Swiss-Prot record:
This is Flavin-containing monooxygenase iboF. One of its GO terms (molecular function) is NADP binding. Glycans are attached at N134, N243, N300, N356, N382, N410. Induction: Expression is highly induced during artificial growth in symbiosis with Populus, which is close to its natural condition. The keyword NADP applies. FAD binds at G60, A61, G62, P63, S64, G65.
Length: 535
């Protein structure tokens, strides 16, 4: 998702290297695990939805949410879009404002992004509350959730790989784009579809609106309550004056729900021995990478960056010209020429690090803090003691979390637990479980998910998922019955060696295999049930 600092020569070499590394057939291939051509089975074995699907809610207006809206709207569904931020764009909406400071140690993954805010029990909806002063400002910030990108961020893939098919870039675009340019492109696509934040005439879009809860909806019948979809509890927060705001809670029912909230919402900071004492003693000097905005904040400092995936390498490189020195702490297995599941810090990457960036081993522990952070010590796994550290940035990634779906969280399970009822989607936050093709809840097939895989081109991949959901819910493409879905899921888990951090990893080859699967399945369905072909 992210690229290196905006120096033309370095950036071009990084993109060329990135593409070469991505396309390299030397890189081990991790199968997506969905190799069975289940769509060739008889229609008698297909899943039947218990209610017709017409009204669909989409949670999130990033690229994948917009792609879902575009496709479902085109297919004739009544589509409603809910976005907690002020404008569309997802992670590509940059602001100088930073997210609310993350706790150390991590919050429980079920509330890793936010703690759902529900109206008082028993009140009539819509229900309002009013705020002023600092309370108002903090409410607005926490509600919209500023995104984890920084001022100098650029894309790490050429425009043709980061575009909506119906909205191509001009041919003369440079290979690397500043985040502001991509943000404008996404907003232009939203405007073209009448779903930008200023399209006030569209009653189906709601910005500044966070989905607090998604729960089963029941309708009273002669035979008792009958399940008919989903009820969403919504909270819209808006500014009413210079330092005042109000929150309005409502509820609305839908036949199906698309989760398009992305993967970069709940920060992960490893629970290293002694870290909490440092965080308590020096709270402003220890942050997650999502707080990083500008390198000037670290001028003449000695900075410890933890993590060797994309953000860690890029932030270390970005702050190096301003900093006195930078330590980049990595795990030994990250120094390799190939890695099937992530962004390796290969010898070629290391050769591009500035002279004042030193690569050091993993942190073993933080020794008891003293009166000043620079006088305190960090012990590495090889026994080295670092002192003089003035700031620490944890570029250690994010965890999957859906606070609005508490019924699908179970943090008590281990990575290798397979049997549990109800079947959770989120456990420890490193991966997702019990999703067919990683896009559809097996237990609740009216609950869809957009672009939850690792190492994919979101713009392109989102369009295939959107078409799949549209056809499945419109009975123009079939899926197996639930018993068969569970069989396929269990076989996939075994093929991938159990659950773990890279369970959702695809990469170039895995994404290509999944696109072949989507294309074969959906075009086979189009031949049987009608509808357009995908390519």
């Amino acid at each position: 998702m992210f690229s290196l600092r905006p120096t033309a020569l370095v950036s071009l070499s990084v993109v060329l290297f990135s593409i070469q590394e991505t396309l390299s057939e030397q890189q081990p291939f991790v199968s997506p695990g969905w190799s069975d051509q289940w769509w060739h089975k008889s229609e008698l074995e297909s899943y039947t939805f218990p209610w017709p699907i017409q009204k669909v809610a989409i949670i999130g207006a990033g690229p994948s949410g917009l792609a879902a809206y575009h496709e479902l709207d085109k297919a004739g569904y009544d589509v409603y879009l809910f976005e907690r931020d002020t404008v569309p764009g997802g992670n590509w909406h940059y602001t100088d404002e930073t997210p609310v400071k993350e706790p150390i140690p991590n919050a429980d993954v079920s509330i890793g992004d936010f703690v759902p805010s529900l109206p008082p029990e028993g009140v009539r909806l819509p229900y309002e509350e009013h705020y002023e002063g600092n309370v108002s400002d903090e409410l607005l910030r926490a509600h919209r959730g500023p995104k984890p990108i920084w001022n100098s961020l650029q894309t790490n893939a050429p425009p043709p790989l980061q575009q909506f098919r119906d909205h191509p870039w001009p041919a003369d675009q440079p290979w690397l784009l500043p985040h502001a340019v991509l943000g404008k492109y996404i907003r232009a696509f939203a405007s073209f579809n009448g779903i930008n934040s200023n399209d006030v005439e569209n009653p189906h879009i709601s910005y500044n609106t966070r989905v607090e809860l998604v729960e089963k909806c029941f309708t009273s019948t002669e035979n008792g309550p009958m399940r008919t979809g989903w009820t969403l509890t919504l909270k819209q927060v808006s500014r009413t004056g210079t330092n005042t705001s109000k929150a309005v809670w409502t509820k609305e029912n839908f036949d199906a729900v698309v989760v398009a909230t992305g993967r970069f919402n709940a920060p992960y900071i490893p629970n290293i021995l002694g870290l909490k004492a440092w965080a308590d003693r020096f709270p402003d000097r220890i942050v997650h990478s999502r707080q990083f905005r500008r390198p000037q904040l670290y001028t003449n400092q000695t900075v410890l960056v933890v993590g060797a995936a994309a953000s860690g390498v890029e932030i270390a490189t970005d702050i190096a010209p301003n900093a006195r020195a930078v330590y980049l702490s990595i795990r030994p297995r990250r120094i390799s020429n190939s890695n099937s599941a992530g962004n390796p810090l290969s010898s070629r990457w290391m050769g591009r690090l500035p002279h004042n960036v030193s690569v050091v081993p993993e942190i073993k522990r933080f020794l008891p803090p003293t009166s000043a952070i620079a006088l305190s010590s960090v012990e590495l796994t090889n026994g080295t003691i670092l002192t003089g550290i003035e700031s620490i940035i944890f570029a250690t990634g994010f965890r999957y979390t859906f606070p609005f779906l508490p019924q699908f969280h179970n943090t008590s399970l281990t990575n290798h637990d397979l049997e549990h009822k109800p079947k959770p989607i989120v456990t420890d936050g490193t991966h997702l479980r019990n999703l067919f093709l990683d896009i559809l809840s097996i237990e609740e097939p009216t609950l869809g998910f957009m672009c939850m895989n690792i190492e994919i081109q979101n713009f392109k991949y989102a369009e295939y998922i959107a078409v799949a959901l549209s056809k499945i819910w419109g009975n123009k493409a079939t899926i197996p019955p639930v018993t068969r879905l569970w069989e396929l899921n269990e076989r996939r888990v075994m093929e991938k060696g159990g659950y773990g951090k890279y369970f959702q990893f695809l990469g170039f080859r895995g994404e290509r295999e999944m696109i072949r699967l989507f294309t074969g399945w959906l075009n086979d369905a189009a031949a049987s049930h009608g509808g357009r072909q995908v390519r």
